[in-house]
Amino acid sequence: MGDNNGIVVVSTFDGMSCGQQALERAGIPVKRYLASEIDKYAIQVTMANYPNTEQLGSVVDIVTKSLPFTDVFLGGSPCQSFSFAGKRKGMSTADEQEILTLDHYLELKAEQYEFEGQSYLFWEYMRILTDLRKVNPDIKFLLENVVMGKKWEHILSKAIGVNPIKINSALVSAQNRNRLYWTNIGMEPGGLFGHEQSIIKQPKDKLIFLKDVLEADVDSKYYLSEKAVSRINRSINGDKCFAIESKSLCLTAGYYKQDRDNQYIVHNTMPRSSKTKKGGSGPLSRKDGKTYCLDTGSTNAVEIVAMRGRKAVLTPKRT
């Protein structure tokens, strides 16, 4: 795979180019990295960190015959319609025709159908991967998405040709984030009939908690205003949120030793509920030192730390 100068990577839904970060940390040289992303701020972050990135624009506009011979193909297609927040509707047109195959999607696209949500873009990932496989049958791929209903998980697995691996990012970070990963990396023949199976093991739990990643000295532009603190106090139980005068106090490692000291109250101002037909907002408590999954739908989430004898209010840093 690749040559002495490195591999060629195409990454769809590239975001801030975590794929490049992972390859860099793994010590894998990259000759060319082509990225498909439309968010201007994500692109700015990528180009600041990896100025040699070749930006391709929207995934729907990629002409596969213009792509170079590709060694690795990455993607994390939108998950909203697969998640509870999206009522697990899956992939469909605006008039509720379910899209179960790539051929069907390409027909609908040619006829200029309007699609529901953004999760249908999985089929754009498959369109590109299908063409890249024709040029390089040994191409390595990786697709990430949310844990979804078994129906849609089966459809994605059938299309891509492998079953997913479920990994919770809590094993290697301070955030609970269960995700599915479809990949042909680390596959070996196994079982009675010699079918290829993944040999990728679950990551070792690094025992990283929120207290381990919070910053002690934070720029004043990230402080909560008195108005914001007052609003939060009105929204949740007063005994769980304590206002401070100007900024959050430093959280030392010793705070986790008492019962309430490691209780992070996560106040989400966006509708959130385990029941898809009900919204609602308010404090969601955890006592394991981890955050709830904070994704693009949680940009208004505010994390409150309730500590016996000390008072602090924290907000997540936006980047």
Regions found by a protein language model. Give the residues of each.
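Conserved active-site and SAM-binding loop architecture
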Residues: 1-319
